[in-house]
Amino acid sequence: MKQYTILRPAPGGAFDQALISLLKQLQSHFLAEASEGRRPVFLRFFLSDAQNQASALKKALEGFPWPVPALSIVEQPPLDGSRITALSLTDSRPADFLFHSLRLSEEEARGLDSYRQSRLLFQKYLDIIRPLGLTLKTHCVRTWIYVRDIDTNYAGLVKARNDVFREEGLSHLSHYIASTGIGGATEGRSETVAIDFLTFPHILESEKTYLKALSHLSPTHDYGVAFERGVRLADGHIFISGTASIDHRGEVLHEGDVLAQARRLLDNIGTLLAEGGSSLERVRYFVVYLRDISDFPLVDDYLQRRFPTVPRVVLEARVCRPAWLIEMECEAQPE
């Protein structure tokens, strides 16, 4: 059985103190999980300042006593004041997926706009999976795309993804891929785009059900982007893409009201989950993205009251349309 946990360091102190605190928590957590028959299979670290923190984190992980599972590191400052927060996945079964957190070196990224950086990252992924006999269309189940200065650079990413998907045989007549496209950064100063790819090498197309919720959300291709709202796998596990306050016409709802947007996006997520045979009560964790850090106390209090037992992390990250003040993603189990 999968177990999702969000871990935070003790409050206060410099980054090196926060890192020591968090890694101690991770060691204790993995030891407790091992006693329940689960082992670590995935970690994502959210940093407040990747350029000053990522190298120290990577060095610390080299000496970490537990085998480091699939790993992602992104700058999306946690809004509870933590300098670093971790999302951990442990499982009683061996990992049945491949995870590639692809980044560009300074030399690769320098001088390239977001379109060309995105094309290069997709090409890197294709160069990895093709020798394994895998395809983007069938075996890539989920992506997370992080865009620095998303208000400026999102359009280039969208065009690149559309072009790659067309070349690889993905369209609105077949399917796209569940995804989050969100503001985020890496330690690379020239890198404007970074992509995490989740791949299931043994999956069949018939084992994926794409969730639409057309009563609440428009098809993404209606407004020129290419991703699925969510996907349900054969075992009932559901990945919900980054979801905002949108209606069936593709319009932003409740401009300027972050709580009304939160309620609407959760209504959208609930409708997607119901289509996949699940519900908000079966969500395993939430990742919450806020455009304006001033909204954190209001949103965090609302989520605590509505989902007091569901792990969550609330991050500073701008959504792809400026009018969207909040976006959320999650994973869920079947009823």
What are these regions (language model features)?
Residues 1-284, 289-335:
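N-terminal presequence-like segments and the immediate start of the first folded domain
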